[in-house]
């Protein structure tokens, strides 16, 4: 969206927020919003009216606000028209990201044991082996597309092994994940996505049948065991949780590894500093999470009770969408917010969210990124961007900030 268009737009649509053009100019747009329009009106098609939140303090407040609900059933009465879902989407929506307490607590408790600090540290050697194996394949060529050859396969292999899913199915997950996070309202895309979600549901049904027959020491088997021991987990919840773990278990990390590498490629002084001072890696990861937040916009929150924010009435059933990317560049919180600084102090970014829905896999994503980037820089010391910076394209995607590809030579 050009600056000329921005001045004439009074309401942003879902398709605009999902466009590549928006991604290209989003940071400048957010900067204007933070200065002059803290709440920006959205038209979200069948979902109704919404508001885009751009400031850090507002984001923190609203991410903890109990008047906002993730499950629309806690907002809409039985007589009111509900948000329309795709036919095959219903089976995949009953997960913790779409739930409120007490359901959220119940669902999160079932899986959080697998994501404790101790459990994540036990994966370190395995992740290191995966990183080395992936680089072994591409190093002789002295070239790779970092997205396809490294950033995507590493986390998908890790989460597949945690869940007990055959590795040969990982390319299917990529297609299905894109359908799940695609917020397009174009009729042909909706039809295609519904078809893909149908494929995914069939796959999950088959996978769960197999796990019931042959349980193993993996996370899906543990969820099935919980389901069989009582009313803790419905079948829809089981499918939805597996879907969420697959998608959230790799999408964020793909973008973190890719966006961090891209930021380092574009800021040679910071890359050189990191090479000279590898102990800055943890700080560099936090800055990458802030600078190019892997999740650009939050998933939907529904207003259960009306309230006033900055003089504007937020009505019941209004949708709230928070730009984590904008909050993480709020100059009131982050001095020189548009500068990539791997030694940034007091980096209170909210790239993994805040409150009840803080990302369960944050520790895993950080460890995967640390190993991936450290191994890449150690084994490929002459890494550089293949092509011009202007040739790199952000994907047109509502939720994520993701590059189409990242060609690098070494």
From Swiss-Prot:
Q: What class of enzyme is it?
A: oxidoreductase
For the keyword Heme, the answer is: yes
Under Enzyme Commission nomenclature, its number is 1.14.-.-
Instruction: Give the required cofactors.
Output: heme
Q: Which residues bind heme?
A: 359
**Entry-linked SUPFAM superfamilies:** Cytochrome P450 (SSF48264)
Give GO terms: molecular function aspect only: heme binding; iron ion binding; monooxygenase activity; oxidoreductase activity, acting on paired donors, with incorporation or reduction of molecular oxygen
Which UniProt keyword terms apply here?
Answer: Heme, Iron, Metal-binding, Monooxygenase, Oxidoreductase
Q: Which InterPro entries match?
A: Cyt_P450 (IPR001128), Cyt_P450_B (IPR002397), Cyt_P450_CS (IPR017972), Cyt_P450_sf (IPR036396)
Is Iron among this UniProt entry's keywords? yes
Query: Hey, which family's this protein in?
Result: Belongs to the cytochrome P450 family.
The protein depicted here goes by the name Cytochrome P450
Q: Which gene encodes it?
A: cypA
């Amino acid at each position: 969206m050009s600056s000329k268009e921005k001045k004439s737009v009074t309401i942003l649509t879902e398709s605009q927020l999902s466009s590549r053009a928006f991604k290209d100019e989003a940071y400048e747009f957010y900067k204007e919003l933070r200065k002059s329009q803290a709440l920006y009106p959205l038209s979200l098609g069948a979902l109704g009216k919404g508001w885009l939140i751009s400031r850090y303090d507002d984001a923190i407040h609203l991410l903890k606000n109990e008047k906002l609900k993730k499950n629309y059933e806690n907002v809409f009465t039985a007589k009111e028209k509900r948000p329309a879902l795709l036919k095959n989407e219903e089976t995949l929506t009953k997960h913790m990201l779409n739930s409120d307490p007490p359901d959220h607590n119940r669902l999160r408790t079932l899986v959080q044991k697998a994501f404790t600090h101790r459990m994540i540290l036990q994966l370190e050697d395995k992740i290191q082996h995966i990183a080395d194996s992936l680089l072994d394949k591409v190093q002789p060529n002295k070239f790779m597309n970092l997205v396809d050859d490294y950033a995507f396969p590493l986390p998908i292999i890790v989460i597949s092994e945690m869940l007990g899913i055959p590795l040969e199915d990982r390319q299917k997950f990529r297609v299905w994940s894109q359908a799940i996070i695609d917020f397009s309202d174009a009729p042909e895309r909706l039809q295609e996505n519904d078809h893909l979600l149908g494929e995914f549901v069939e796959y999950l049904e088959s996978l769960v049948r197999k796990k019931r027959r042959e349980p193993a020491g993996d996370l899906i088997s543990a969820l099935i065991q919980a389901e069989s021991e009582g009313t803790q987990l419905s079948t829809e919840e089981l499918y939805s949780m597996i879907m969420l773990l697959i998608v959230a278990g790799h999408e964020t990390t793909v973008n973190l590894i890719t966006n961090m590498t891209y930021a380092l490629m574009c800021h040679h002084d910071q890359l050189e500093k990191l090479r000279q001072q590898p102990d800055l890696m943890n700080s560099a990861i936090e800055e990458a999470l802030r600078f190019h937040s892997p999740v650009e916009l939050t998933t939907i929150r529904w207003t259960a009770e009306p309230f006033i924010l900055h003089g504007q009435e937020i009505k019941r059933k209004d949708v709230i969408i928070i730009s984590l990317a904008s909050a993480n560049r709020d100059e009131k919180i982050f001095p020189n917010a548009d500068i990539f600084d791997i030694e940034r102090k007091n980096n209170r970014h909210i790239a993994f969210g805040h409150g009840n829905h803080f990302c369960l896999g944050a520790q895993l994503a950080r460890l995967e990124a640390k190993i991936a980037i450290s191994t890449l820089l150690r084994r490929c010391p002459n890494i550089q961007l293949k092509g011009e910076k202007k040739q790199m394209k952000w994907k047109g995607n509502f939720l994520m900030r993701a590059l189409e590809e990242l060609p690098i030579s070494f």
